[in-house]
């Protein structure tokens, strides 16, 4: 597939040809990365075609978060990131499959069916932005937008062999993103390489008056300032990699060796055990989800239950029929931790621990420029691999820290396991220092020159 950098130099006629080629590929593909062929969404704006995750509003398109409960909901306005794309010669072209309401790590909970990993169709693409990552890796998209609540851009990028960037919280507007956990959610790019990630990130970043959490900063210029010659002081968290598979640990050590040979300084640091972070993350995210998803009741928009007797039954049936099992589980657990008698014991304590985690990251970043970790404990696993929801939640063990602390993080493919499946590693930077993330990743990408095909 042509890169985003290359596509931006095409004429309008050439872009129309490219869109037709992508549409034909999607129709012929069995990956199920797109919800439907892009042409079925209606006419798209002029510009380089960018795949959009199915929780980002595109005016006139049916946007469902891959859930039955939003069946038939047509977005009445553009998300701010879509308007930003239009201002930078890009446009939405198709919606990608995802875990329902972004609650999952495998893209198996979508009402549209599973998405397959293009590297091995018997394996998951990761999630929740699995459709976006599978499309980019499978040659079905120039680039894509995803959302990241606890690793939902970075983990599928690692599983599929793409570059995935979660910007600093507040760097990219969330206006028009259908919320899962408002204090963690962030929109970001999934691309074929670091240059493309930089270009797409620059296009969607910047202050937005329509988002009260948007940082009052100008759009970034990371692509213009990309520098592969900078050297950084990089922290590693040895205690945190003990849960990784042997293949991931080997890739981690080999990448560390490459970073040292490139002239970067590596230092060891310690912080709160990552298993505590998992508990904190899920308590807060489920609590916010139970509140955010209360609006989907069958009254104002989306799916409405039929043959009901009264308002109570309308609510009950619409939500029971419309939400999948994982979403119901998180809503119930979220309501539990917010309930009387448990609020202080769970939710309040989790928020207090979140502040401690932020302080620990800030303390580390007083001495270093970046933190280096794996993205996931394993490479992509087979479908129906997890024996329980708790096992699935543990797959986020390396990514949630950046969401808890609002920091930027980037997933870069660095190796292949014995089966040829990609393995990604993650850099985390100080707040609003995406430039360092992209610089070190750009240099490492050039150094490793990993061939996945």
From Swiss-Prot:
The UniProt record lists the keyword Glycoprotein: no
Catalytic residues in the record: 53 (charge relay system), 128 (charge relay system), 152 (acyl-ester intermediate)
GO biological process per UniProt: translation
Class of this enzyme: ligase
Domain of life: Bacteria
Cellular component, GO annotation: glutamyl-tRNA(Gln) amidotransferase complex
Catalysed reactions listed for this entry: L-glutamyl-tRNA(Gln) + L-glutamine + ATP + H2O = L-glutaminyl-tRNA(Gln) + L-glutamate + ADP + phosphate + H(+)
InterPro entries: Amidase, Amidase_CS, Amidase_dom, AS_sf, GatA
Function: Allows the formation of correctly charged Gln-tRNA(Gln) through the transamidation of misacylated Glu-tRNA(Gln) in organisms which lack glutaminyl-tRNA synthetase. The reaction takes place in the presence of glutamine and ATP through an activated gamma-phospho-Glu-tRNA(Gln).
PANTHER family linked to this entry: GLUTAMYL-TRNA(GLN) AMIDOTRANSFERASE SUBUNIT A, TRANSAMIDASE
HAMAP family: GatA (MF_00120)
NCBIfam families in alphabetical order: gatA (TIGR00132)
Family named by the database record: Belongs to the amidase family. GatA subfamily.
Quaternary structure (record): Heterotrimer of A, B and C subunits.
Protein's UniProt name: Glutamyl-tRNA(Gln) amidotransferase subunit A
């Amino acid at each position: 597939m042509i890169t985003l950098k290359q596509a931006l130099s095409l004429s309008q006629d050439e872009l129309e040809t490219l869109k037709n080629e992508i549409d034909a590929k999607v129709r012929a593909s069995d990956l199920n990365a797109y919800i439907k062929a892009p042409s079925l969404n209606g006419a798209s704006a002029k510009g380089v075609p960018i795949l959009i995750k199915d929780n980002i509003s595109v005016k006139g398109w049916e946007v469902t978060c891959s859930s039955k409960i939003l069946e038939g909901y047509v977005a009445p306005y553009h998300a701010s990131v879509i308007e930003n794309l239009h201002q930078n010669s890009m446009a939405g072209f198709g919606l990608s499959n995802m875990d329902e309401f972004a609650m999952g790590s495998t893209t198996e909970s979508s009402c549209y069916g599973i998405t397959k990993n293009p590297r091995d169709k018997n394996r998951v693409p990761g999630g929740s932005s699995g459709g976006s990552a599978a499309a980019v890796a499978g040659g079905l998209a120039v680039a894509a937008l995803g959302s990241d609540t606890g690793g939902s851009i970075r983990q599928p990028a690692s599983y599929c062999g793409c570059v995935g960037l979660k910007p600093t919280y507040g760097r990219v507007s969330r206006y028009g993103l259908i919320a899962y956990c408002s204090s963690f959610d962030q929109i970001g790019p999934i691309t074929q390489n670091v240059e493309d990630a930089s270009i797409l990130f620059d296009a969607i970043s910047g202050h937005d008056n329509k988002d009260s959490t948007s940082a009052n900063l100008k759009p970034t210029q990371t692509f213009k300032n990309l520098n592969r010659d900078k050297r950084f002081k990089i922290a590693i968290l040895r205690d945190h990699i003990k849960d990784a598979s042997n293949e991931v640990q080997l890739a981690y050590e080999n990448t560390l060796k490459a970073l040292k040979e490139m002239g970067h300084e590596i230092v060891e640091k310690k912080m709160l055990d990552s298993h505590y972070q998992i508990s904190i993350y899920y308590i807060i995210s489920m609590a916010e989800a139970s509140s955010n998803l209360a609006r989907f009741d069958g009254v104002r928009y989306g799916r409405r239950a039929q043959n009901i007797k009264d308002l109570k039954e309308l609510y009950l049936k619409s939500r029971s029929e419309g939400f999948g099992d994982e979403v119901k589980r998180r809503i119930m657990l979220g309501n539990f931790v917010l309930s009387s008698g448990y609020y202080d014991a769970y939710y309040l304590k989790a928020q207090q621990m979140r502040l401690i985690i932020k302080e620990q990251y800030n303390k580390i970043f007083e001495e270093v420029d970046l933190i280096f970790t794996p993205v996931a404990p394993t490479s992509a696993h087979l479908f129906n691999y997890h024996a329980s929801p708790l096992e699935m939640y543990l797959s986020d063990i390396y990514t949630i820290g950046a969401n808890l602390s609002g920091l930027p993080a980037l997933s870069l493919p660095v190796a292949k396991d014995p089966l040829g499946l990609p393995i990604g590693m993650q850099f985390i930077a100080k707040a609003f220092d995406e430039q360092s993330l992209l610089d070190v990743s750009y240099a490492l990408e050039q150094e490793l020159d990993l061939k996945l095909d």
